[in-house]
Amino acid sequence: MRSAQVYRWQIPMDAGVVLRDRRLKTRDGLYVCLRDGEREGWGEISPLPGFSQETWEEAQTALLTWVNDWLQGNEGLPEMPSVAFGASCALAELTGILPEAADYRAAPLCTGDPDDLVLRLADMPGEKIAKVKVGLYEAVRDGMVVNLLLEAIPDLHLRLDANRAWTPLKAQQFAKYVNPDYRARIAFLEEPCKTRDDSRAFARETGIAIAWDESLREADFTFEAEEGVRAVVIKPTLTGSLDKVREQVAAAHALGLTAVISSSIESSLGLTQLARIAAWLTPGTLPGLDTLHLMQAQQIRPWPGSALPCLKREELERLL
């Protein structure tokens, strides 16, 4: 016997969270809980403002329609990426496809303070990997901060994310301030320039490896082994169903590229599922999931070790 519940939620964010030039005051989303007999599965649907094609309201309409279809015995998935991902996660839990084992390590997001980063990395087992957002300030400043971190911590590898912020000139200004001897310890720089061709040229000219992120969601993108391209960053909430995520990971691995499962600022429930997906599909690769500290609360399932309060399902608004 099938049954389902849908919950709507809103989590206050820390004051300093800015996405694409807009401040994110709250993180809004939905949960779906599917039941079939004794089995249960949860999924999170939380379109990311400025990045997702669909709004929260559109996702809610699509989710409620899909849930009603599922209750009638239909097995298809919605088209909207965030809804397809959340629904497929709930189904994967329900059927036991999604393993319980999780990779709760996360590459810490660094603000540029090497002392703070040394402390955060001290307890990290294995490789010392951190992530730095670049492109928010002057390119020269970014280059100096990255150089300082790599100089201060000799076994550090950095993942950098520019979100296509730079012109070719700005990208070169950044590289100029990173010691060529340290550049090999930049694991990758996500989408440095506004166009893929400019990003490819940057990688060739500087020896700094790049990764594709936004490109994966463009219609003309194809997976290829290219000089200077080392990784792809996969954000499941923006990608679509779990099957589509698996296909992208497999395509990357077949070409020798690193595939990194990355957060779209999901709630703790969604993040714990991403940690399980990372352990399952990209074992041995540190996922990019260090976003919970941007929020003021957890929900339903807590992240191990987090001191944030965790709301129970009874405290959420139920729609179905």
UniProtKB/Swiss-Prot annotation:
Its cofactor is a divalent metal cation. SUPFAM superfamilies: Enolase C-terminal domain-like, Enolase N-terminal domain-like. It comes from the Bacteria. It catalyses: (1R,6R)-6-hydroxy-2-succinyl-cyclohexa-2,4-diene-1-carboxylate = 2-succinylbenzoate + H2O. Transmembrane segments: none annotated. Keywords: Lyase, Magnesium, Menaquinone biosynthesis, Metal-binding. One of its GO terms (biological process) is menaquinone biosynthetic process. Signal peptide: none annotated. GO terms for molecular function: magnesium ion binding; O-succinylbenzoate synthase activity. It is an enzyme of class 4 (lyase). Belongs to the mandelate racemase/muconate lactonizing enzyme family. MenC type 1 subfamily. Converts 2-succinyl-6-hydroxy-2,4-cyclohexadiene-1-carboxylate (SHCHC) to 2-succinylbenzoate (OSB). This is o-succinylbenzoate synthase. It comes from Salmonella newport (strain SL254). The lineage of its organism: Bacteria, Pseudomonadati, Pseudomonadota, Gammaproteobacteria, Enterobacterales. The gene is menC.
